[in-house]
Amino acid sequence: MSKQAQSRSRKKARKNIPAGLAHIKSTFNNTIVTITDLSGNVIGWSSSGAVGFKGSRKSTPYAAQMAADAAARSAQEHGVKKVDVFVKGPGSGRETAIRSLQTAGLEIGSISDTTPLAFNGCRPPKKRLV
């Protein structure tokens, strides 16, 4: 097989998906934004680290904004216009990521918090002495 034909077959096919789901996982150290179709297949994703932030800068709201913007752009290439948002975690980039999805041009249908809560599970980390 020639090199040109081989590279053409590797390119991802562009789907036309009008609606999807946006999963925002915001931890104390990072923010991951994943956009899927309605059945859960990943269309596009991004994270604070993938955008180019390292170390403690990954946990900032600005890094979450940039990650959400990059994920929204990759989803819009597949034709996504409307998303339902699921937010998980206690991080600082939760609201900023949602706002950034809106300003990127995605219409937000609903926002739901899916943060897991322990019913007396593992002992949480001790408070920091700063």
Curated annotation (Swiss-Prot):
SUPFAM superfamilies (UniProt xref): Translational machinery components
InterPro entries given in the database record: Ribosomal_uS11, Ribosomal_uS11_bac-type, Ribosomal_uS11_CS, Ribosomal_uS11_sf
A biological process from GO: translation
An example molecular function term from Gene Ontology annotations: rRNA binding
Domain of life: Bacteria
A single GO cellular-component term on record: ribosome
Keyword annotations: Ribonucleoprotein, Ribosomal protein, RNA-binding, rRNA-binding
Function noted in UniProt: Located on the platform of the 30S subunit, it bridges several disparate RNA helices of the 16S rRNA. Forms part of the Shine-Dalgarno cleft in the 70S ribosome.
UniProt family annotation: Belongs to the universal ribosomal protein uS11 family.
Quaternary structure annotation from Swiss-Prot or TrEMBL: Part of the 30S ribosomal subunit. Interacts with proteins S7 and S18. Binds to IF-3.
Name of this protein: Small ribosomal subunit protein uS11
Name of the encoding gene: rpsK
